[in-house]
Amino acid sequence: MLTKDGESYVSLKQDICFSIPSICSADLAARCGLDAFPENAIQLNARIEVLKRLREVQRQVEVAVVGLSRQLHSIYETLRSKDPSQWTEVTASEVANMIHKNPTAIEIYAIHKLLMDNPMRFLASNQYAANQTFRIRPMNEVKDLEQVQQWVREKSPALDRFISKAREVADVQVKLRESSREDQPSYVKGEHLWSETDKTIIRLCVASLGHQRSIQLNPYLALVGHIIRHFYDMRTVKHDDHEIHRLLMDIGVFTPWEDLLAIDAGYRLDLDTRLAVVQERDQAILRALENSKEIKPRHPEDFYPVDPLESIRHDWGNLAVYVVDDVGAEELDDGFSVERIESEPGSMWLHVHIADPGSVIPPTHFLAQNAAQQAESWYTVPRTFPLFPKSLVHHPVHGLSLGIRSKNGIPDRVLTFSAKLDSAGNIVDYAVRAGLVRNVNRISYDSVDVALQIPSPLFEYPFGGAPISKASPAPSDFVEDLKAIREIALKQRERRIAMNWLAFNRNRAEVKRVSEFPSPPNGIVGAQIDTPHLNKGFPNLVYIVSSTRESGDVGFRSVVAEMMKLSCRVAARFFTDRNVPAPYRTGQPLIPTSEKAIEKLLSKRDELGYIQEAEGLTDFIYEPRAQYQLNPGMHFGLAIPEGEGYVRVTSPLRRYNDLVAHWQIHKVLLNEKEGKTSKDGVKGMFDKAWMHNYINTLEIQSQTLKGIQRRHNRYWALNYINNWQQTFKDGKNRHLWPRDPQGNPIPDPLEGLEGYTISGLISNQLVQQVQLNMVIPKLGLQPIVEDVVADLDVGVVLGTKITVNLKDIRLGMKANMITTIDSSRMKWPPS
């Protein structure tokens, strides 16, 4: 990147927030070169020309911003939510159109700069680079910021009074926590009361934990840093996020089992667990189900009064449908059947039956709109945030989860994706139909593994607590069908490996709850400010380390995954053959360092196509992430060739984009029944322009949710380890130390840590240290290695084995494990 001052440096793609393509041509940009300094006269002259243009743009922007600055307050007052506690959103272009009739790129950029420079009121969204959307801070939060700023500036005694009281509360809370290590989590009514001044400071501390991109200044940093320094008598504060989280736990506002990501207001999850509120919502849904009369619903509370596809549903009669999932699964989206073809030995039809929420919920319903915003069900450690309410999903008559209606003598509505497969596992024909299934059989993955005598996935439990499998085999009359289905899956795997497919085997940590978490005293998940409480105990959790290979290609779980892939390929053919727009999921192959590197990688594959990550890091540059697009394309990760396509349709109860595809199929099936076709294909519910816009939104949501899931998994893994450390610190509570099946104490999982590097040496200017990123397979985590003594010019080969000691666990919104190199167990720097 070339700056207006002539400096050149590398920038992350996601940190580039605004582009004006017309400033210079691609040719002029190319002539500037990529080096930090110009290497010849051509590069120098090109850079001089670009700098002239940049400075002219800068001059125009400065003039525009001066005029806009005076309007900042009125812009905020006009756009903020009228509810002083709620966030709202606006794009830079929308603000520009409020002020200018036909805003130029310079005027839009001036708005972008003005709002970006005012984080107290305007916060750049997580995917700002893609949508230029700002979140507008609620008025209450702005007032809290302004008030605490004033108190800090004036050295108000209000802060001293709060810190004095907070220390007294923390003394009680910390002692209570230490004395209740064996207890189940619970709330204890506090004897303290927070004043209105205290509440202002606490609200500010809570709000400071909201996720914010580093591309903007953080208006909370100086304020919470001041509070932390005085509360903990620190001279300097380097990790505000971690320390403010610690403070809020120490004074009982947060519990150690609070899920910081879920309570972030930016994600708009339903945090109200009050029984009366939940019951009223459920009753409203049930009333709407009974009262909806419009065949074409228009009101946001109207469901379909009758099934839109009732006249064209294929009745599958007594055909056995197998729904295989985890024992505790709540939303059962999919089941499958096999139909042998007597006249064609080796060939068979696979029918994948998917729950059909589109038969009840129209796109206009408020539940659909809420689902569009949430994007998918959230499975957090403390609780599940379903895409649709349980009262609807499990309703005995209108229920959407497979098996609910048929259990009550009413056939389940499904969309069935059928693939005719030859003896080699190739799709030679397909069909997509609306259907009715009656013979739904729910069984668990483990019971099928036992019945078929195949290995189940092997997961590691480094902190103990491995469950003892008690699964009984699936009924014997299911076995032949289940074997046939597994044979289909094995052929798909063979096909994939023959296409030179490969994947890296990586370990990943996951924490699961063993028992339910307590409900918050006020019934609303999040900070307990108005009703002061303390807390004790810690949830019963289990720490699991799974590998990509075991979770993806071992046991009947992998068979079900292959069936879902086949149905998504069928869906793609359905849309492609009819020229109907759909959200195709694609993924390009990894980028190798050379042609020889490809051969090297392929030679390292095991029988399932996997390579241990540490063995392949030096042979590829990067793995392109999966994307959505309007046309069918390659998906290397699923071994789908260019042009075939893949459209997700198998989880409409858990993913909104699958439901979008279902609605599209509904309309196509109805139009085909009525003969409404044209030379351009069959029309769906959504046209190409709508689908294009939706795919842009879906792409943003997909990347955001992946990031959230990574942070969530890391936070809970580190929270678990932090609690483990505190429980057994200084030899305490040894009677609680887990034991193996033979009754012996398990080895200390935090001793003898080793792994491999996944980055070169990093000079972190913020903390003035040389660092490394690494993987510890035993824990399934990627910690930071600090205090690295090494020559930056020498570097470290990716995949280098490394031994480390645990230095620190930092929680907060950006949880991290910090390690240091254990030079007693390895030579450092490596030669």
Which residues does each PLM region occupy?
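C-terminal structured domains
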Residues: 786-807, 827-830
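Short glycine- and acidic-rich boundary segments immediately preceding or forming the N-terminal edge
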Residues: 233-320, 324
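Electropositive polyanion-binding surfaces
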Residues: 5-7, 15-225, 231-233, 302-790, ...
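Beta-strand/loop-dominated core regions that host nucleotide or nucleotide-derived cofactor-binding catalytic loops
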Residues: 12
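Eukaryotic N-terminal targeting leaders
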Residues: 1, 830-831
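Internal insertion modules embedded within essential enzymes
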Residues: 809-829
